[in-house]
Amino acid sequence: MTAQPTRLTTAQEYWLAVAAAVVTANAYYIHPIIGDVARHFGVGAAQIGLVPALNQLALALGILLLLPLGDRFSNRTLTILFTIGQCGGLIMMTLAQGLTLFTVGSTLLGFFTIAPYLLPAYASKRVAPERLGHVTAILTAGVIFGILVARV
């Protein structure tokens, strides 16, 4: 017999939404500052346009390749690992002296932006069935908030 997972408190549900917002926003912070990044690296619009394009392509690839792991492994563990992967991409972008390394870091960041898609599955096992729709809505709002705030 397996032990019942601990139920989430209302505060924990909202903190998961904040986490979803933060990890989602990481993939979108480049958009409002793309001109500044292009000037910093001394490149034109065509070259800098690859950065968000590859980030989003890597996100799609991450959804295709990494998200199914949530069916076999702990969503909590995967969320932690993928968030660490995001941090690695962010560190690479921060330390990049050239556009190539910056682009690789951004691509890794996109690839590991899977946590927002794992959090609803994690939460669904830890809330009462009658609260599932409400909690899913809170987490979805966190993802949308992250996308919108990152673009400001």
Go through each PLM region and give its residues.
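Paired small-residue
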Residues: G89, T100-L108
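Residue-level signature of mid-helix packing/kink "hotspots" within the transmembrane helices
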Residues: Y28, Q56-L64, I114, I147-L148
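Juxtamembrane helix-start elements in MFS-like secondary transporters
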Residues: G44-P52, T136
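Cytoplasmic helix-loop-helix junction between adjacent transmembrane helices
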Residues: G105-A141
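Glycine/proline-centered helix-kink
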Residues: H31, I63, I138, V143, ...
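Conserved MFS/SLC helix-loop-helix module at the cytosolic interface between two early adjacent transmembrane helices
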Residues: L61-Q97
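Structural signature of transmembrane alpha-helices in multi-pass secondary transporters
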Residues: V23-T24, P52-N55, L59, Q86, ...
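Extracytoplasmic
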Residues: W15-A45, I63, P116
